[in-house]
Amino acid sequence: LCAERDALRARGIYRGLGLCAFIELTTPGPAFYGVGGARISSQDGCTIKLEPSGKLICLTGVTEQGQGTDTMIAQVVATAVGVRLEDVRVLTGDTMVSPYGWGTWASRGAGIGGEAALQTGKALKENILKVAAAILTSEPLDLDLRMGKVVDAATGEARLDLAELGRIAYFRPDTLPKDFQSELTVTRHYVP
């Protein structure tokens, strides 16, 4: 750029070089919209359910606009729960089934939607480990979920495949302790 500037200057054309810094407001919370009475949701929700196949379905109020929101949500969920990325299916944009939110607006997907997905994923993992503990007659704290398998938390030894856990929880609850409730669909909302 400097060489081009100098060449133009030699011909009597004066151009400079400039630098501009800009900060865009993103992920505004309730105080931003609520005080003005705008009917704009400043929170977002996420629902994740474990299918009997061991795969996860994630419903979120944020939407994909070409900036990778679906992939980001899938990565957050896979990491929070302890499954492979390819085992997470993200569904967006269906207001009949997804938790209430206000979409992406191109700059709030990760900040609000990603946090809702993280909180939901952590809660689902906790519930999955409770089911696994009931199946394995163990304690939830002695187990972990890694790459879609319930493992011994101390040794990493595989104890139960997530698909088998799903099969038992959905189709053989009679083999679980009396009055045990498998909560394998979780919804959480995040308000910044």
Language model: regions and residue ranges:
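Cofactor-centric catalytic regions
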Residues: 1-57, 65-80, 93-192
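Short acidic capping loops at alpha-helix termini that bridge into adjacent secondary structure
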Residues: 84-89, 141
